[in-house]
């Protein structure tokens, strides 16, 4: 897409609308989701960023097959795009990704260590200069994408006669839509630049 951050944001609007128009939506969750949409919508979503490259778009730790003595692989390329590296980095590090399978939310120090290691590993093969201003933007839209997907999924899970249900997935979806989690995303990743000073 010409504007990857805008594209993600628009995808989020459609997913969130499924929940926001649902008569069983939790009012507190709906209000916080609307605040996220409103405030993230005011960010420079159409700005140009770093060099374009192929991105996985759903990068998480489970997609890496690490082999000590032979080649390692990145798998699960269902939705690759030409975008910016910041899109995959944000998805990999965002709390909406790390919390899904591991119940872990990376703190600033852990994210900083990862980003410094990433920049050392790139070692000039690609321009990482745009990360300082693009990564915070992708962090916020990635967080919105995670909670919007959960909002849509909760409505789908509630449909009568749903054939497939997974209690662990449902528990996690509800955790993402809790007032505490949504407020954490809003206060720490939207209203505050979580990455300030750790991305150079």
How would you label these PLM feature ranges?
Residues 1-31, 45-46, 50-52, 81-82, ...:
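A cross-family kinase active-site recognition segment
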Residues 3, 125-141:
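All-alpha amphipathic helical-bundle segments outside canonical DNA-binding/catalytic cores
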Residues 7-11, 35, 84, 88-91, ...:
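Generic alpha-helical secondary structure signal
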Residues 12, 36, 147-150:
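Amphipathic alpha-helices that form helix-helix packing interfaces
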Residues 24, 31, 146-200:
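ATP/Mg2+ or Mg2+-diphosphate-binding catalytic cores
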Residues 28, 32-35, 106-110, 114, ...:
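Soluble or luminal CAZymes and related metallo-dependent hydrolases
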Residues 38-87:
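Active-site acidic catalytic loop and adjacent metal/ATP-binding pocket
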Residues 88-125, 140-160:
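Active-site activation/catalytic loop segments of kinase-like enzymes and analogous catalytic loops
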